[in-house]
Structure formats: structure tokens, C-alpha cells
Amino acid sequence: MSLWRPSEATVYLPPVPVSKVVSTDEYVTRTNIYYHAGSARLLTVGHPYYSIPKSDNPKKIVVPKVSGLQYRVFRVRLPDPNKFGFPDTSFYNPETQRLVWACVGLEVGRGQPLGVGISGHPLLNKFDDTENSNRYAGGPGTDNRECISMDYKQTQLCLLGCKPPIGEHWGKGSPCSNNAITPGDCPPLELKNSVIQDGDMVDTGFGAMDFTALQDTKSNVPLDICNSICKYPDYLKMVAEPYGDTLFFYLRREQMFVRHFFNRSGTVGESVPTDLYIKGSGSTATLANSTYFPTPSGSMVTSDAQIFNKPYWMQRAQGHNNGICWGNQLFVTVVDTTRSTNMSVCAAIANSDTTFKSSNFKEYLRHGEEFDLQFIFQLCKITLSADIMTYIHSMNPAILEDWNFGLTTPPSGSLEDTYRFVTSQAITCQKTAPQKPKEDPFKDYVFWEVNLKEKFSADLDQFPLGRKFLLQAGYRARPKFKAGKRSAPSASTTTPAKRKKTKK
């Protein structure tokens, strides 16, 4: 990007010419060939608050953490269109062109009924009710924590791109060398960016922050986030991404209100300035704790405000990438707290037919989620001119490597060594080192893998999303049965001759 900047003589100089990022529509040609691809029913079940490790091996998880407040990041693998066996290959030239997929339709299906899941903490750092207090609270005791539960902020979110989404959160920063931090001082804060992975926690109403590093009590927020990082999508950063690969488009719906008002127990780190109040007497001589916090609530969930289970058609992406699936992959990020019901499961230890005894039963919590991903892909072609290949190489060299355009080394003119007895123990091993597999740039991140390499179909009318696409695009499916013409009568059949009219 070229910008005008002022010089020392307060004269604005013209910018230096630089290469510009262009839209994929300028070098990608779309065809009239469409495919449908859909996943199987995707299910996951676990504990809504924390993962359960194995008793004899804490590093092994026997029950994962599955919450309605987690991000679901699906990494959708697509087949290579350049290896497709098309019935008619006359629409492109494999010598000078390459094929890519463009996502033009998406539907995220959600099963399970609407419901509100709650969370809480058996030892929440709550001192007093500051909303409707009928007395002035005195000084806190040694331990004033209470068992409190609440519902969370309501969020529905769907992000689509060919790279993982970027999140933001507040974490502990590094102080300057001349600002020494002593125990008990408030640490400096820093806005950090990180990749949103499958299983990361969303903003629940307590802020997008690193609760592990910034809340040492482990009791200021509910159990499911007290030792986690709550991330919020960094829309500003993703929208400003030059090539537009991270975010094609997004759907978002958030709502929250505050249900209760409390304050914390503990010592106030930054006292209220004396010029903000007039000192009291008696029970008000000592100020109450001024560290207030609310309990969030997402309010009512309703089917009238759902963004899922409906198709979306992408005509124009928000960035320069207009839906082209570089690397034959897509990243679909989903959040849906409107189906966060936590199921209560009870198992009997001993039979108690006559009287109820709570110790005879064990109580468990489980949360289950159900997804279904459906796509419509359009086949596109790219003509490999020198300018286009140079531009793609500057954007992402791995794309050309996938198209078998890597650099080939010239033949060596030096003398090479060749041993006679290659299996002899008297010489060094002659086995060639195996070729290293291509390194996955996202191997260090956790995603929900969805393989659609064998799920493509050109029969769009055989799938619900395909029929919706044909209807809105004005296409008609090819008829499966041809209505034949009525057969002509046989030659032996004769028609009676008409009687000639005569005048009298």
C-alpha cells in the first residue's frame, strides 16, 4: 500500500510505487461447473466444565471438555481439482492452466434443542450483594467465598476463510526495566493475538482475557474459564489482512444483560481517592470493597433469532480473496451458545427401593453437540502467465509447489562416487534418505478435521443445499427420465374413406 507522507520541508511527497494486492477475480476464471460436498453428522460429548483425566495417568484424558461456550473450528479438506477425472476436459488446458475451488454456498446445520447452559463455582469470590443491600457490609472475613451459578452471554457466530481465524485477548505484559513490579501490584496488560483453535473458550461476559495469568485466586469467575483464556475474534485484524484469506465473511449475533451485582472480598489494591467521598462514621467509617462485578446473562433463546440451519450464498467476499480455497482447504469457525444445555446423568450405587438416600447415587454432567456442514463449490481455472505466477509466488509459494512448479536443480557436472558392493559392511550405508513429507503449517494447532475428499457430487438436485442453490440460481436439473414420443401407428392400419357428398 502506498501512502503520502510529509517531508521535513512540510511538503507532501508522492508515494514510492509498490505492487498492489489485486482481487482474485482479476486472474481467476469461473466455470459453470458446480459440486456439492457435505460432511457426515458430526458429534461430540464431554464434561461442560473441565476435562477428566485418568486416575492412574493424569496426562491421559478419558472425558474431554465439551462446552457450549467453546469455539468449534472445522478444518475442511478438499480434493485436488487438478487430479479430478472430468468427463469433458475441453474446458481447460492442463499445460497452461490450473484448477481451484471457489466456495459459493454454505449451510451449517445444528442439531439438538435450544437450551440455556449454566456455569458457576462452588467457591466464587463474592462478598456482598451491591444491588439491593439492606445493610452496610463490614470488613471481609478470612474466606467469604460462596457457591454461585449463572448463565452466560449469548453468542452465535460463523466465520469462513481458507486460513485459521485470529483471536484477541488481554494478557500479562512485560513491565519496563525502570518500573519494578512487587508482589501484589497490578501487572501491566497487553493485547495479544493468537490463532483460535477448536476448544478455545469464547467471551462469556467476563471479558476476553487470560484468567490463568491475571486472576491468581482461581475463584473470580466460574469453573469452566477460571483456568482458561477467553478469546474474541479480532475482526479488525482479519478484515485488514491484505489477501483476505483469513475471513471471507462472517455472521455474528451477540446479546447480554446483567442479572446481579456483587463486589469482591479482599484488599482493594487501588484505594478510592478521598476527594470522591465524605468520610462516614460508625458502620460507614470503613469503606466497603469497591471492586464491583456483575453476573452476565444471555436472556431468552428463541428459534426466531437463529443464524444456523439456513443457506448462505457468497457473491462477494469482504476481502481480496473472493472465496478461492487456496491449499484445497477451508476453515469454518462456529459458536452457538443457544444450544448449551448441560445434561444431568445419575447412576445408582446401591438400590434404595423404599427410602431415598442421596449417598446411593452419583451425579454427572455431560454436554453434547451436533453439527452438519454442507457446501457448494464452483470450479475455477487460472491461466499461468508469468505475471500471475510471480504474484501467486509472492502471496504464497506453497501454492505453486502444490501445482508442481518447484525449482529443479540443474544436472551436476562433477564426478560422482559409485560403490560396487553396496551391501558390504566395509563401506558407508548407501541407502538414500527418504524424502521428507511436506510440513503442515498448522500442525501445532488443534482443529476438528473434516475430510470431504470423497464427498463431492455433481448431482446437486440430490441434496437439500444443492436444490436450494439450483432454485436461487435459476438452473434446472437434468431430467432423469426422457418422455418419449407416442409411437406411430403400424402400416397395416387403414382409415375408412370419407363418403363423397353429392348434390341433388
Curated annotation (Swiss-Prot):
One of its GO terms (molecular function) is structural molecule activity. SUPFAM superfamilies: Group I dsDNA viruses (SSF88648). Residues 480-504 are annotated as: Disordered. It is found in: Virion; Host nucleus. GO terms for biological process: endocytosis involved in viral entry into host cell; virion attachment to host cell. InterPro entries: Capsid_L1_Papillomavir, Capsid_L1_sf_Papillomavir, dsDNA_vir_gr_I_capsid. Keywords: Capsid protein, Disulfide bond, Host nucleus, Host-virus interaction, Late protein, T=7 icosahedral capsid protein, Viral attachment to host cell, Viral penetration into host cytoplasm, Virion, Virus endocytosis by host, Virus entry into host cell. GO terms for cellular component: host cell nucleus; T=7 icosahedral viral capsid. It comes from the Viruses. It holds the Pfam family Late_protein_L1. Belongs to the papillomaviridae L1 protein family. Self-assembles into homopentamers. The capsid has an icosahedral symmetry and consists of 72 capsomers, with each capsomer being a pentamer of L1. Interacts with the minor capsid protein L2; this interaction is necessary for viral genome encapsidation. Interacts with protein E2; this interaction enhances E2-dependent replication and transcription activation. Forms an icosahedral capsid with a T=7 symmetry and a 50 nm diameter. The capsid is composed of 72 pentamers linked to each other by disulfide bonds and associated with L2 proteins. Binds to heparan sulfate proteoglycans on cell surface of basal layer keratinocytes to provide initial virion attachment. This binding mediates a conformational change in the virus capsid that facilitates efficient infection. The virion enters the host cell via endocytosis. During virus trafficking, L1 protein dissociates from the viral DNA and the genomic DNA is released to the host nucleus. This is Major capsid protein L1.
